[in-house]
Amino acid sequence: MKIALIRQRYTDFGGAERYVAGVAKQLAHLGHDIHIYAGSWRASSKEESRSSSRSGITFHRVPVARGLSFIEVLSFALNSRRLLKEENFDVIQSFERTLYQDIYRAGDGCHREWLKQREKIDPWYKKYLHTINPLHQIILAIEKQLFTEGHYRMIIANSFRGKDEIIHHYGVPSTSIRVIYNPVDVDRFNDPDRMERRDEVRKTLGIAASDRCILFVGSGFKRKGLLSAIMAASKLRQTWQLIVIGRDHASVYEKEASRLGIRPFVHFLGPVTDVEKYYLAADLFLFPTVYEPFSNACLEAMAAGLPVVTSRINGASEVVVEGTNGYMIEDPLNTDEIKDRVEMALQLNRNSVIHYNREYLKPFSWQNHVRQLLEVYLEVTGKKHQNG
């Protein structure tokens, strides 16, 4: 099939971006003719030339007006529509809020729901500023059109919670939404030298073998709940250490850790390229996010054999089985609840968690994920042929 994939920034660095790159490479490997429409692209391999017949991927640069963020969003949506209409594709799948596509994958969630949830962590006046902020108004306008009948042939949600949000806010029929969970490369996190890697990382960071090591991975600390994680950790009875990985301004959180008297026990590492070894060094993954469509980091933690403690509002909570491989947080701002869930998760038998996660994640392979995507593609192409 000749397939167009739309992503404003295409790269194999970063969670959502790596996912799109993975889809493109997997589909190209199966012999499909893949065309990437992006405003910019950057990656670690030579295939990121404008056209690569060897990789089966062709890149098309979409003009984007730089400057104000709302202008960038709108110009990408308008220009990608213009360029896509100049070509004939069997399937057009967008990973962005755009104006011309057959399939939209709502990997970034529902913006209307995010604005609702962020009221929990924003000052009271921000709610009113959002109503006049042109960026939010543009995103909401595109999102509304995107979910209007006639502007899509199928929608893919990465969790059942995400599906319910779209139905609730926009009235999209349930039959028009397919839930396909994110994939994970289990082998990437299944190091046969697990204990050796664990000891190396702990020694480098000054973490004792007997310390309970908690890991937080995610960029955008405010939304993903780092403040709650730090405050909850300060209440733990066990001897613990917290590793924080991700891109954001850490100074606010460093000051809070100092205020609580726990600064020496919180390690801010920034973004890293070798995150696998930190999963292996940890005893538990903590992710008390305020809103998250589906956290790839939770899947990665499970693949590394960690119990996961995360918010129910995280789509990835649907793969957490309480009391077996982790626990869920009902209120991501309730640090007492988070502390209790962490202590409960640390009591789980680690070998049992490792074995359970390994078996549970078998259907989450890239091979199975792409098979599910292709089933949707075939359904959509069938509809297109029926409608002429």
Predicted regions and their residues:
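Short hydrophobic beta-strand element within catalytic cores of glycosyltransferases
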Residues: 307-310, 320
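Carbohydrate-associated surface elements
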Residues: 161, 183
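A conserved mid-protein helix/loop that constitutes part of the nucleotide-sugar donor-binding site
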Residues: 18-22, 212-235, 251
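Membrane-proximal helix-turn-helix segments that form the acceptor-binding/catalytic region
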Residues: 132-158
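Aromatic "clamp/platform" in nucleotide-sugar-dependent glycosyltransferases that forms part
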Residues: 271, 290
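Short glycine/serine-rich donor-binding loops of glycosyltransferases
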Residues: 295-298, 316
